[in-house]
């Protein structure tokens, strides 16, 4: 998983995020540990420090030894380097564990989750009637190598087992300890806040024939698991890709076709342990 997300650092992720065009960098960021990247101590960064032509050649080869070369010339010209502009914000450094706190909120990004120094620009939005404000830490998408942590203090008298951290409205964990609820942070540019879910998922029959189709919906913490039995015997329901549906082909279950009545019991549980039981009779 870490290697997959490290590819974001090897490419120009910000350009891809805005254009969906992917370019690879000719250098490695200091915290990029992709095992197939090899550079010298300069990490592939070229210092054009003379007024002359520099001929660069890129060689791309595959495992069969086929290769293609592309050469081009960069003309070195003396240029005045402007003074760096001091931007406001908090710098998270790639080579250490970083943290950031506000009243009732604490963010931790452990060592190894950033591939370069990153300037945080924390932003908050007030949410009237909610358990917390919402927070974002970067002006655009900024994925981490793996998950960091964000914690919120629960300052209202509610059932803590129903509180969770939402990331852009999607469940992102909810471990409660000593008044704090902790969830996952995968992208510093997403919005995080507390949410509450004491409502069970909905189970709606779509088809109850030989091929059973049920619709599962949960608009808050999301469905975590489900289990089904027919006449007390376990049967498998498969999820349908990109749709809130689960299906069961009765011909692939232990239930024999006798054209008699059978009882289907389907239990769905969401990420805050709210449970919905759907029962019906089917003829098979």
Say what each PLM segment does:
Residues 94-120:
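Predominantly extracellular/luminal regions of secreted and cell-surface proteins
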Residues 112-116, 156-160, 186-189, 218-223:
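Short proline/glycine-enriched turn/loop motifs at strand-loop junctions of beta-rich domains
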Residues 149-153, 211-219:
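Short edge beta-strand/loop segments characteristic of extracellular beta-sandwich folds
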Residues 142-144, 204-208:
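Short, solvent-exposed loop/linker segments at the N-terminal edge
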Residues 198-202, 223:
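Proline-centered linker/hinge motifs at extracellular inter-domain junctions
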Residues 86-95, 120-166:
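Proteolytic processing hotspots in large secreted/extracellular or virion-associated proteins
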């Amino acid at each position: 998983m870490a290697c997959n997300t490290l590819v974001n650092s090897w490419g120009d992720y910000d350009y891809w995020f805005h254009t969906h065009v992917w370019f690879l960098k000719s250098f490695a960021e200091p915290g990029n540990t992709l095992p197939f990247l090899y550079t010298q101590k300069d990490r592939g960064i070229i210092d054009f420090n003379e007024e002359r032509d520099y001929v660069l050649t890129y060689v791309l080869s595959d495992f069969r030894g086929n290769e293609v070369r592309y050469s081009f010339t960069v003309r070195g010209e003396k240029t005045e380097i402007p003074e760096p502009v001091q931007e406001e914000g908090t710098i998270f450094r790639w080579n250490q564990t970083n943290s950031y706190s506000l009243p009732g909120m604490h963010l931790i990004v452990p060592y190894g989750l950033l591939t370069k120094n990153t300037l945080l620009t924390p932003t908050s939005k007030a949410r009237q009637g909610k358990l917390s404000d919402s927070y974002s830490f970067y002006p655009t998408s900024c994925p981490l190598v793996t998950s960091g942590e964000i914690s919120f203090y629960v300052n209202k008298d509610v059932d803590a087992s129903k509180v969770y951290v939402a990331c852009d409205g999607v469940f992102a964990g909810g471990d409660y300890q000593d008044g704090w609820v902790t969830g996952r942070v995968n992208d510093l540019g997403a919005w995080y806040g507390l949410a509450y879910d004491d409502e069970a998922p909905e189970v709606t029959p779509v088809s109850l024939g030989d091929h059973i189709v049920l619709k599962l919906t949960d608009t808050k913490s999301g469905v975590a698991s489900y289990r089904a039995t027919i006449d007390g015997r376990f049967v498998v329901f498969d999820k349908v890709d990109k749709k809130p549906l689960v299906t069961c082909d009765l011909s692939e279950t232990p239930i024999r076709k006798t054209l008699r009545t059978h009882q289907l019991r389907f239990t769905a549980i969401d990420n805050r342990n709210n449970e919905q039981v759907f029962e019906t009779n089917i003829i098979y």
